[in-house]
Amino acid sequence: MRYFTKVLLLLALIVPLKAEQPLGLKLPTANDKIFSANPEQFYMYTTRNFEGVSSKPWTAGQYGYVRNLKRTDEGVIATRFHEGIDIRPVKRDKAGRPLDLVNAIADGKVVHTSKVSGHSNYGKYIVVEHDWGSGPFYSLYAHLNDITCKVGQKVHSGMPIGKMGYTGAGINRERAHLHLELNVMTHTEYPKWHAQYFKSKNYHDKFNGLNMNGLNIAELYIRHQRNPNLSLISFIQKVPVYFKVTVPRRGALDIAKRYPWIRIGNHHGISAAWEISFSSSGFPLAVTPSNRAVIRPTVTYVKPTKSSHSYHTKGILTGTGSQASLTSVGERVIALISGSFME
């Protein structure tokens, strides 16, 4: 019986749960300039005033640290992270309102619609769940004028699900755009975490943006165009690690149960802790058993930098050089991914 159990455990470690499927990605609108020599025709700009100079950089519509410039020991760096991409409209009516239809980027199922613009900075938005064989991924379509799909509805790649708009915080008609993300979900019990840390009402159940971690969807589109057989796992594996946090082990992590690619090493063995690897945006890249004994979440690696780590980690870390510790924001983030809020 013991031998049989060991065999089952070994099989669980080496046999994938499901074969990865082709992504079949399509752009969500008629704007395809992301693949051209003129990306400024694809991305929507933001207004900027830095050191007395006003500008409208289209680059601020890209994914990554592209906003809120600061002059530091490393020079001028952008310190505000943008989780997705902002796509310009290609059609407007006489009043300047966008006419672009918004389409599903891949086959999936609608799992959330937010039809009241005041309930989120996203304005009116849609979340579609996709299963490519590597755990559930969630595309998010924000600042919509209209939503034409329903929760539970199956959608196909390229199928219209809404109409571009300018709902949500800080957006006017001139800057109307589609904000697009592709995310993993941090924890399925997010509402409990939200209730513990925030007084504001959570209108979005587990599909709240704070529970979503977005990957670089622009880079994914470009690499997918070059290689239609690209897998999400191979894409994620190339994302560099910026920091690692080791947490006391109190059972399997919720995120590791849903995303087999995140599990590194023997998760069925005994260890004192989990070491979680993150990108600079806080995107979880790996969960590895660790024999390091910790009584609280501890930063065990950080990429050295001359400026504050807070500028490079969405405020999750503080410190400089090769030294870092969690901020209060970081402690909340780690509580969510580790599930310590459930204790």
What is the predicted function of each stretch?
Residues R2-L10:
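Sec-dependent signal peptide recognition
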Residues R97-L99, N103-D146, R173-H179:
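Zn2+-dependent peptidoglycan hydrolase active-site motif and core
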